[in-house]
Structures are given as structure tokens and as C-alpha cells.
Amino acid sequence: MALFRGMWGVLRTLGRTGVEMCAGCGGRIPSPVSLICIPKCFSSLGNYPKKPMSSYLRFSTEQLPKFKAKHPDAKVSELIRKIAAMWRELPEAEKKVYEADFKAEWKVYKEAVSKYKEQLTPSQLMGLEKEARQKRLKKKAQIKRRELILLGKPKRPRSAYNIYVSESFQEAKDESAQGKLKLVNQAWKNLSHDEKQAYIQLAKDDRIRYDNEMKSWEEQMAEVGRSDLIRRSVKRPPGDISEN
């Protein structure tokens, strides 16, 4: 399982353009976003039909163990790149075999979904759709965060309070995380104005670091055609930089 979890992580780094897995891969490598299949409906009610793997993912899951056996010391990222290259060079006739399997399973899947929904009450169906929307939004946000991490977006600046917490949390004498945070929070409130000024200055320095790194990063994004990630305007949060 760890091997395939690693595979999923690397697959999302292979490129931005491509067709979505859920629509079938064709000859192009899926994008980081499309590599994560988000079920149109998923419910905690259980027994929801499992969505079939795309042609490319099916090929990848077949090839990864073989590559791992041949190259036991190689990183998963290196193996995935080799598999991606192998897929690109795969004859169209062989790709069509994978695509045909996907289409056949997709048809069975859609029929199973229809039968599953027929068994639900109106209230259960509404709950299913609501849950699906929430999961899609949550997954979309997760994918966006992961993409920004992969693209090296600078970490946001920390407030004076957050810097103090990161320095003091482990030293707090309490076994529970909640207890530690409570102690650290009280200790912050008890700091004198002069003591807090040191952390406020660190926060200001971190803001300068962030602004400089963001300027450089956005220039890089413009160069690689990702202007959609560039801020239209820089908005500073209201309030003192020391606020938590």
C-alpha cells in the first residue's frame, strides 16, 4: 500500500495538461488535478459502487511492481517517470485495449450507480448529493494546496503569536496537545510589551521574507504560463501583526 500511495503522490507531479482520468486517458498524461478521481457521488451509507481506474492508471498499477522488482533501489518518482515515458511510447493498438477495458467497466459502474440510487429514499438521495458536493469542494481545495506545494509556493508569514507558539509548544509542561496550547496561550498573554516586541520584529522580518519570495515565485509562474496563480493585488490582513 505504501508503494501505491507514493505512486499517487508522484503521478500528480507529471504535468498540468491532459485529459481527465474519469473520461479515459487517451495518449496524454493526466494532470495533477485529474489524476485524483473524485466520485460524482459518494456516501457514508456504504456499498457505493467503486469507480473503475482509467486506462493510464490501470497501466501504471500493472507496471509499477514490475519496475520495482527490476530496480529495487530506485525512487518511486523515477519509476513513475519511466512508466509515463513507456505509456507515451505505447502503440495506439495496445492503448486501445486499456481504453476498451475502462469503457466496459465504466458502463457497468454507471449501471450500478443507477441501481444504487433507486434504492435510496428522497431524503437519503438529497443527503448523498449534499455529501458529494462537500467532498468535491474539500478535495478540490486539497488538490490546490498540494499543487501549490509542488510548485514551490512560499509559506505564508507567521504572526508574532504563531512564532512564539512554535518556539514554546514543546517546552510546555502538559501531556496533551490541548493542554500545552492552553499553557502557551496564557504565557503569551503574560509577556510584557518589551518581550512581545522581539516576536513582533521576527514576524515583520518573516513578512519581508514572504513578500520577496512571492515576488520571485510569481515571476517564475508567469514565465511557465501559470499566470492564474499570480495575485491580482496584494491584500494585507487588517490588525496588528502580533495578532493570532
UniProtKB/Swiss-Prot annotation:
The record marks 57, 181 as: Intercalates between bases and promotes DNA bending. SUPFAM superfamilies: HMG-box. The mitochondrial isoform is widely expressed while the nuclear isoform is testis-specific. The modification Phosphoserine is found at residues 54-55, 60, 159, 192. Residues 49-117, 154-218 bind DNA. Keywords: Activator, DNA-binding, Mitochondrion, Mitochondrion nucleoid, Nucleus, Phosphoprotein, Repeat, Transcription, Transcription regulation, Transit peptide. Signal peptide: none annotated. GO terms for biological process: mitochondrial respiratory chain complex assembly; mitochondrial transcription; positive regulation of DNA-templated transcription; regulation of transcription by RNA polymerase II; response to hypoxia; response to nutrient; transcription initiation at mitochondrial promoter. Residues 1-42 form a transit peptide. One of its GO terms (molecular function) is transcription cis-regulatory region binding. Phosphorylation by PKA within the HMG box 1 impairs DNA binding and promotes degradation by the AAA+ Lon protease. InterPro entries: HMG_box_dom, HMG_box_dom_sf, HMGB. The modification N6-succinyllysine is found at residue 66. The modification Phosphothreonine is found at residue 121. The keyword Isomerase does not apply. Pfam families: HMG_box (PF00505), HMG_box_2 (PF09011). Gene3D superfamilies: High mobility group box domain. One of its GO terms (cellular component) is protein-containing complex. Binds DNA via its HMG boxes. When bound to the mitochondrial light strand promoter, bends DNA into a U-turn shape, each HMG box bending the DNA by 90 degrees. Monomer; binds DNA as a monomer. Homodimer. Component of the mitochondrial transcription initiation complex, composed at least of TFB2M, TFAM and POLRMT. In this complex TFAM recruits POLRMT to the promoter whereas TFB2M induces structural changes in POLRMT to enable promoter opening and trapping of the DNA non-template strand. Upon metabolic stress, forms a complex composed of FOXO3, SIRT3, TFAM and POLRMT. Interacts with TFB1M and TFB2M. Interacts with CLPX; this enhances DNA-binding. This is Transcription factor A, mitochondrial. It comes from Rattus norvegicus.
